[in-house]
């Protein structure tokens, strides 16, 4: 996952930045792949903008493109 420099999260490393495409990295295990697909789907719900990851404390992460 990449970080978002303009994310409102306290821990910017928990912010996921997705563009217009579903760039999914297949990691070592099937579980990791499923997690990435879920993250991509959640990001798509927010118009492809950054969204806090599951471990981020904030609930309304507002990132620009």
Swiss-Prot record:
Protein biosynthesis recorded as keyword: no
Any one GO MF annotation of this record: copper ion binding
Residue stretches in coiled coil: none
Keyword Metal-binding in record: yes
InterPro entries tied to this protein: MT3
Function statement: Metallothioneins have a high content of cysteine residues that bind various heavy metals.
Family designation: Belongs to the metallothionein superfamily. Type 15 family.
Annotated protein name in UniProt: Metallothionein-like protein type 3
């Amino acid at each position: 996952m990449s970080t978002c420099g303009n994310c409102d999260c306290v821990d910017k490393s928990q912010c996921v930045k997705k563009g217009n495409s579903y760039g999914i990295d297949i990691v070592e295990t099937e579980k990791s792949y499923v997690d990435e697909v879920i993250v991509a789907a959640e990001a798509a719900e927010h118009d492809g903008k950054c969204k806090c990851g599951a471990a981020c404390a904030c609930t309304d992460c507002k990132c620009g493109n």
